[in-house]
Structure formats: C-alpha cells, structure tokens
C-alpha cells in the first residue's frame, strides 16, 4: 500500500540521503538518485535537491492533484498549486477496483478526454449564486468563475470548507485543511464574492 496522510510527507528523505551518499562513493557520482515517498510539496522537493539528498524527486500524487504543477512553478504561481491531501482515495494503481486514477481534490483528473472547464468560455456570462461554502460549493463557484461568470458564494458559518474542516481534525486527514484553503484562495483569485 502507498503511504497516506498518517505518514509524514517526504518520509523517505533520510533513507534517500544515505543511498545517495553510498551511490556517490561507489560510482564516483555517475548514478542519479531519485527521491520518492509522499513528496507532495514543491518546497520540500526543492530542498531535497538543493540539499544534495537526491538528484531528482518523484511527485506523482502531487501532479495528479494539480496537472499544472510544473507550469505554475515556472510562472511563479507556487501558491496556486492545488495541494495533495495524501488521502489515497483515487490515486492507487489502475485496476478493476479503481478504473480511473484520479485525485480527491481535482474532479477532472482521470477524465482528461471529457470536457474540462476552460477559462472564459461562457457564451453568455451570468450572475451566479452558489449557496454553501463546503467542498462542492467552493468547486462550483471556482469553475463558474473560471468559465467567465460573475459568482457570489454564500456560507452560513464563519468559515468556508464545510466537512473538509471536520475531516482535517481526524488522524491522517490534516491536509484536508490545505485543500479547503486552496479552494477559498482560488475563489478569491478568480473574483468570487465571498
């Protein structure tokens, strides 16, 4: 099984450092070492490379969570990268039990051949009201704004995120708060009135 939110991100980095040191000595630094093991934050990945722990970093689940991860980094938009929750809900190897490899935080991952929300595609932009600032409401507001609509999001409580905030309190689910914060941040970035 893959490590999930119960295991700290980057849990293999010290082992990787030991392997890299041994490989460097044994091969006169001719073999590259790739770090892996729940590395889902770009800051941690960059640190692993700059600190000499590894020559490269594998970030599969991070890229399932945000297929534009590399492009956003290149554009200087690291704060806009959708975080991986390490939930393992949809990111296991594709088989008959899990026919689509996807991400809990990105409903479009795994459905790349279907229509994707494209920025500014609304033929007739409208005023859209979304009631409820939980995960579904935040995502609906985000996608509507991406498509060019003017969106207002109403939430009865004093905090957006709904049940993601509750889930984040459970063992292994703390990263759900990061996803809720990202959704709120994206809504703000896209001009959604909160």
Positions of predicted regions on the chain:
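Flavin-dependent oxidoreductase catalytic cores
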Residues: 1-131, 135, 139-151, 159
């Amino acid at each position: 099984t893959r490590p999930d939110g119960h295991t700290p991100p980057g849990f293999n980095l010290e082992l990787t450092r030991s392997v890299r040191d041994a490989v460097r000595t044994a091969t006169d630094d001719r073999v590259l070492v790739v770090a892996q093991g729940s590395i889902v934050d770009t800051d941690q990945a960059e640190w692993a490379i700059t600190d000499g722990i590894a020559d490269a970093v594998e970030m599969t689940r991070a890229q399932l969570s945000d297929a534009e991860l590399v492009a956003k980094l290149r554009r200087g938009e690291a704060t806009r990268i959708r975080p991986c929750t390490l939930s393992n809900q949809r990111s296991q190897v594709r088989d008959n039990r899990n026919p689509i490899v996807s991400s809990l935080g990105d409903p479009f991952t795994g459905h790349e051949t279907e229509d994707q929300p494209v920025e500014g595609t609304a033929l007739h932009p409208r005023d859209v009201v979304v009631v409820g600032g939980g995960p579904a409401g935040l995502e609906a507001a985000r996608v509507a704004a991406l498509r060019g609509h003017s969106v207002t999001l109403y939430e009865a409580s004093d905090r957006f995120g709904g049940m993601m905030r509750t889930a984040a309190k459970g063992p292994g689910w703390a990263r759900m708060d990061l996803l809720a914060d990202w959704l709120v941040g994206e809504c703000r970035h896209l001009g959604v009135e909160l």
